[in-house]
Amino acid sequence: ALKKSPEMEPGILFTERQFGLLELHSSDLSMIEDTGNAILHGIGAKAEDQLAPKILFHDIIENISDQHSIILNRSRDASILTPGVSLLIYEMQPALFACVAANEAEKVAPNAIVNDIQMMGASGRIFMSGSTEDMQKAKDAITQILSNVKGRPS
């Protein structure tokens, strides 16, 4: 795919037995779509062959304490969780749908802070913080977008 579109920029190549990931970047959306179609053609698949997302868990924790924020921030380099905000935790399968979900959540809650996106492996997680109202909007947007993705049942 990259031979046909050398101006595409590779972002991530993560290999795993069952759930690998190839991330490509371009400012031209049609080039992204054409490259995606070339990859699917190359492996003899179509978009509908993907696994449909499955929602595993979601919750909004209101008014995070300082102790909780310290524990959750231990492995963070940026976008730290601050005491007093609400925290949205959303888990789904396959993991890569966490990227789609986070993108939709940011559209409806632009003031929210994306604290972490775990997008590799079998299950993915999003940790977002902000006002309770924004976290509810984000949760609803994620649920809607994941429910509308076509794919085969897992």
Where are the model-predicted features located?
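Positively charged, small/polar-rich N-terminal and surface patches that mediate targeting and assembly
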Residues: 2-20, 25-104, 108, 117-122, ...
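Short, glycine/polar-rich helix-capping loops at beta-to-alpha or helix-loop-helix junctions
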Residues: 113-115
